[in-house]
Amino acid sequence: VPCDYTRIFEVVEKKKDLFSANNALQAHFNRIIVVSDSAHAMGTTINCLSVAQVADFASYSFHAVKNLTTAEGGCITWNPKNGLNDEEIYRAFQIYSLHGQTKDALAKTKPGSWEYDIEIPGYKCNMADIMAAIGLAQLERYEGILNRRKEIVNQLDAGLKSELIQVLP
């Protein structure tokens, strides 16, 4: 069951005078940034909007038990309607996920591109090629997977109707 993002944004806007930005991204919003934990929410909608569209940022998990899997890993999306500089955000995520390096492995294979900088103490959390291949295969069959999950939910709902259990919408 998703959060009431309308209410969350009402509270964030009402209290934004208490907010003090610590970096350029925060200053752009001039309020608390709302992040949706969308780990299990790939393909879901809220009021006809993708779950990725209701918050400033949305994080997804691609763990083996999630709706779309790469065995491990995940992704972060952001809502472009806020006038964000997509390239700057992408570059920041790339650097943080590649040990702080300014070039990924593919970029370093090009002639004369072996040189790179380490700008920050980053992390190793970029997706391996084999995991990406699994994810692409899952994505091709995702609509069928999602439809099958909906069928199972409908069967469970129907089976529980005779019990003293209230099924949430």
Question: Which residue ranges define each predicted feature?
Answer:
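Active-site region of PLP-dependent enzymes
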Residues: 22-27, 40-47, 54-169
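Catalytic PLP-binding core of fold-type I/II PLP enzymes
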Residues: 1-48, 80
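Glycine/serine-rich loop-strand microenvironments at binding/catalytic pocket rims
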Residues: 1, 53-54
